[in-house]
Every structure is written in C-alpha cells, then in structure tokens.
Amino acid sequence: MTKEQILVDVQEAVAEKLGKDVSEITAEKSFKDDLGADSLEVMEMVMDLEDKFDITIEDEDAEKLATVGDVVAYIETKL
C-alpha cells in the first residue's frame, strides 16, 4: 500500500467521523485545531483506523498524532 493510498483511506475515515468533506482533509490539517475534533473523536478515529489497517496504535503514540499527515506516516511504518 502506497503512502497516497493510506492518505486516501485516512481522509475518508476522518471525513466520515467528523462529517467533513474529503476535500477538507489534507495532510497538514490538525485534528483539533483545523478540523474541530475533540479528544473522544480523535480516539474513535484511532480505533477505526486500527481496524481498517489491522494495526495497533499505542496510546502514547496516539497522543502524538496531531495531524492527518502524522497518522499517515505512522500507519506507513506499521504496514
């Protein structure tokens, strides 16, 4: 799976969870500051992405994933 494919999958998951248009979800966007996600929504997205990619994202790592790009890079290392 390429980085671009991961980004598309993450964009779709984030857009669905937050009720945003996929075009609003770019790698540079911060979940909390730019996309308005609260802590619960971020944790739910992490769980959704764990299921989608069949990976485990440790809690201490999840806390460091501030942007969409951070998540894509992290998932890339786990695949």
Curated annotation (Swiss-Prot):
Keywords: Cytoplasm, Fatty acid biosynthesis, Fatty acid metabolism, Lipid biosynthesis, Lipid metabolism, Phosphopantetheine, Phosphoprotein
Example GO biological process: lipid A biosynthetic process
Domain Carrier: 4-79
UniProt keyword annotation of Methyltransferase present: no
Cellular component aspect of the GO annotation: cytosol; membrane
This protein's record includes keyword Cytoplasm: yes
Pathway(s) it belongs to: Lipid metabolism; fatty acid biosynthesis
Cell location: Cytoplasm
Residues with O-(pantetheine 4'-phosphoryl)serine modification: 39
Membrane-spanning segments: none
InterPro entries: ACP (IPR003231), ACP-like_sf (IPR036736), PP-bd_ACP (IPR009081), Ppantetheine_attach_site (IPR006162)
Record PTM: 4'-phosphopantetheine is transferred from CoA to a specific serine of apo-ACP by AcpS. This modification is essential for activity because fatty acids are bound in thioester linkage to the sulfhydryl of the prosthetic group.
PROSITE patterns reported in the protein's UniProt record: CARRIER, PHOSPHOPANTETHEINE
Any GO molecular function: acyl carrier activity
Source species, domain of life: Bacteria
Protein role: Carrier of the growing fatty acid chain in fatty acid biosynthesis.
UniProt protein name: Acyl carrier protein
Gene: acpP
